[in-house]
């Protein structure tokens, strides 16, 4: 005997699920709800309890009879006040009503979010008054238009022995969630494989791409102008293969970071005379993480030092064992520069495609991924799209990431205008309102108004997410956050006076690795720390490191407002030491520098035996006699020292406030120029 659910047994034996569950509890048999499966032994016990002949009327049937009696009484009372004609009419109507068949109660109902009492009654094939009575018995006062929550709906439905299922509605603005849903098998048709070529620098990736392109472009397309749109197709044995002509690693990192899976097969290019190199290992990791098949192309076989056996031996360490050695990885010896082995490689790609059975449904609205995008002065926004499912047509309304529009024109990889593009076809389109990012998903829609609405909603959601409050962190509380597990990566923005310093600092900072927390440099630049640097730091939750440069007035104000930690240094090893100390929890500075004001040099005077006097105007804060100063020229610190004199007219003063003029001389420094900024600072003790 097969297992049966509680509500199914109740229905079979014409009893309510509630009564059955009560009976089961009396028999010391635990059931959680009406969906619980009953074992054969339990069913046999129940059969003994409910003899086959003794059929109990269900609660629903009892209520139906009661309802008819009530209705009949009401009608008879009304008819006492009416004439004979009305009585005959009533009898006719009553007779007609008696002939109306009873609507069967459904086995299952579905709902989304909530239902009103009226809607629930309709779904359960019951009168609203009946549902209201049941709710009243449960202590819930409800009207016909009142919304019921999920628990109440399930409670009422369970009482009738009806299964309830809640539908989860996915907003069309989040089309990524259903863009990859599989279509019915009968609608799927074979599509070309999408191939990415990866490998170490100078192992021949670009040469291989060029060799394939030059040898396999269809003869009929020879007159077409080959243009770089980020992807192209070739014909092999009457079948097409799509190659992504973009940096291989970028395809995996940037696109996979946005949830896009575009590659079907990876070609790993390894030079026969060089073997496995660091980027080769990185490429293997990317391909394995993406879960795509790997075909190894052993390139440069024309060189005298070529040693394919060595390559195979080295790759076995990374679980890429050749078929000849009992593994399942395809190895193809080639010479990209001479065009040898290219045909064999392409045949292997077709073989893998055949085994993997790449399919898509061309008879639906298109969906896919952005490969490249740019802004052209003449054409506007241009985006290269890879159609992964469906068919894209000129004129289709489309949403791409947070941008939207209508496909105005489509250009193929050979520069020809096309009207349709099927699965695995790369095309360049125009017509979007803004430039999307590589890896953004796209979807075509039937209605332009709907596409615009979805695009605007997505853009608004992205803006809200970007503006969302983030907990800023500084070096002082960094160790605590690391200990609590809140920080796995430290974002830094590095600015310096010259490019060499930027590169040296970035290289040194990237090597820091304390307690599994790594340093990530999100931006570098030469020159003063600007307001845009602070805004980027705020959005990325980053710390700004300045080497021999200073923030301008706006940057400083924004940093205070956004609570961004800005660290300024003049010695590289001090920067590294400070970051490492902060990560290890040993950062304990006794003093902290506090900038108290800035003055702009408006005019200079050279005086014998005194030196250069700077006529200044205090633009921010105040300048004090005992403060340290630094001279900033075009955002770069050119000198750091002490004030020699501070005067107002001819009098020595202790301080000069904002919006006042003053005369300043700097100890042991006379090369002051108009436009220089004199920044005053003091060292304050930090309370720990």
UniProtKB/Swiss-Prot annotation:
Chain residue ranges for the region called G1: 199-206
Ranges where the record places region G4: 299-302
tr-type G domain sequence ranges: 190-359
InterPro entries referenced in this protein's UniProt entry, alphabetically: EF-G-like_DII (IPR053905), IF2_II (IPR044145), IF2_N (IPR006847), P-loop_NTPase (IPR027417), Small_GTP-bd (IPR005225), T_Tr_GTP-bd_dom (IPR000795), TF_IF2_bacterial-like (IPR000178), TIF_IF2 (IPR015760)
Region (G5): 335-337
Keyword Endoplasmic reticulum: no
Function of the protein: One of the essential components for the initiation of protein synthesis. Protects formylmethionyl-tRNA from spontaneous hydrolysis and promotes its binding to the 30S ribosomal subunits. Also involved in the hydrolysis of GTP during the formation of the 70S ribosomal complex.
Protein name per Swiss-Prot or TrEMBL: Translation initiation factor IF-2
Organism: Bacillus mycoides (strain KBAB4) (Bacillus weihenstephanensis)
